[in-house]
Amino acid sequence: MSDDMSMGLPSSAGEHGVLRSMQEVAMSSQEASKMLRTYNIAWWGNNYYDVNELGHISVCPDPDVPEARVDLAQLVKTREAQGQRLPALFCFPQILQHRLRSINAAFKRARESYGYNGDYFLVYPIKVNQHRRVIESLIHSGEPLGLEAGSKAELMAVLAHAGMTRSVIVCNGYKDREYIRLALIGEKMGHKVYLVIEKMSEIAIVLDEAERLNVVPRLGVRARLASQGSGKWQSSGGEKSKFGLAATQVLQLVETLREAGRLDSLQLLHFHLGSQMANIRDIATGVRESARFYVELHKLGVNIQCFDVGGGLGVDYEGTRSQSDCSVNYGLNEYANNIIWAIGDACEENGLPHPTVITESGRAVTAHHTVLVSNIIGVERNEYTVPTAPAEDAPRALQSMWETWQEMHEPGTRRSLREWLHDSQMDLHDIHIGYSSGTFSLQERAWAEQLYLSMCHEVQKQLDPQNRAHRPIIDELQERMADKMYVNFSLFQSMPDAWGIDQLFPVLPLEGLDQVPERRAVLLDITCDSDGAIDHYIDGDGIATTMPMPEYDPENPPMLGFFMVGAYQEILGNMHNLFGDTEAVDVFVFPDGSVEVELSDEGDTVADMLQYVQLDPKTLLTQFRDQVKKTDLDAELQQQFLEEFEAGLYGYTYLEDE
């Protein structure tokens, strides 16, 4: 159902005076350039996200249609005025479709460039994001597309949608008899279903059920390679991988099929180097090794027709274009070129036909299309005032700190900034210990902490970020002086990979980007867990432990956007503290500046989450009512409390403004 079929939001702030009046002075090109570099938007944004002249994040879901763009900050404010609750996912299905077109186009160019005669299919592994909006947006893109399943539930979803694609279905993962029968039923219905053998125990069941159903199975084999990528997901590939057959087992499978008279059923070769491959060299090495499997299987009389290179196509979460865990040092064209060339070269060298190439590029398709937007519910700033001099009879540690402070302001002093900082830290440490033993009063402790903050600020002003020797001190002080921002979201629900594997996601304010980022901040969620904090942020060409922030009003802080959360995060999110799924909307942007918004997920209520843990909301309401009736409160107040409790049960799990 469409919430707002045409919101009429302008596509470009510069073309509409109503938005121009929001800010008297448009952002200068110099400031724009600085902000783009600070947050690396030009690289991870991939032309989908940019900063407009108002200093707001703008979204262009299809870079081939640059006039179709929307001011995200203004969109969120408009939605809030219409009742939108935060946090919420803002999803852009047009980005999904553009990603699919872009990958298909890259492989088309590579095939034409190298004279490759085989076809290419992108098979979407729905485990990356199984939401209906994602699957159906990709299917309706008009592009060739296959679907991959890794479980019975996923296979049921894939088979139900298969009539819309009439393409390729790849079945991976552990399989029981029911899973295998479902896949064979799909084949018997006329779909091209590849059952990929991951364990030798599967083949006997496949042959048995194929005979029962009187269907010729279409099989694949997953080979376990010696080649392996690096990074956070490296264990999903290589010789120690959870899935796949070793070389000896591949030979055993071939002989089993030969003896059963089903060797012609083995048509697909599959391998997987790992997810989010950062280094193109690792990809090239793995494809060359797998190409040898293709050659050797043909020598054994196996007519492999499809070459499934699996996943691995990464995205640049950092925007550093590097080999780091959350970046990539290649683009779509280089990725496609390396795969097509390696397979084609092996075929030409051995006089073999060019197979159909399949990639399972789920992350690269989905990551960019979703932004989590939330509000800051509280800010704790390290505000400081320089205290007055201590009394003459004050303890020595206080006197020492004051002497250091005075020396910092004396002209011509030869002590280093680091030395000043170390002296003040040692004095403060002594005061904290003394406070615990009763030597110092609360007032004296507060005085020392205020003076230390003043010293940190003074040292920070004199440090040069371009001086490599100053960088460790700068990082230390930025952590010490950073604002604490309490954000209305659950890290465990909305960005579980940031908690579980320390993955980095681009995070930045949606507005105020027309100002120099002079402040630093750390982001904390609203769960009752110390792990509910983001530890790493983009900061130019590096990664920092604090987030650059433009100056802002702490009483009215900007909304924040958590970008590139479209892959895995919605599916992996957990229910810590019973925070549930957020609301989600699909946003469609058109060249005339109009915007269509559809509510795709209303988000979980408190009652929904309680039911997950077998706490029946009606029973809880009854128990609460019984308690209220036993109080000596007047009837009107009892009724008020009951109504508030019931409203809370069916309200949002996140914090809501009155």
Curated annotation (Swiss-Prot):
GO function terms (MF aspect): arginine decarboxylase activity; metal ion binding
Record's keyword annotation contains Cytoplasm: no
Keyword Magnesium tagged: yes
Annotated positions of the N6-(pyridoxal phosphate)lysine modification: K127
Binding site for substrate: F307, D308, V309, G310, G311, G312, L313, G314, V315, D316, Y317
GO terms classed as biological process: arginine catabolic process; putrescine biosynthetic process from arginine; spermidine biosynthetic process
Main localization category: periplasm
Location(s), subcellular: Periplasm
Entry function: Catalyzes the biosynthesis of agmatine from arginine.
Family: Belongs to the Orn/Lys/Arg decarboxylase class-II family. SpeA subfamily.
NCBIfam families assigned to the protein according to its UniProt record, in alphabetical order: PRK05354.1, speA
Protein name stated in the entry: Biosynthetic arginine decarboxylase
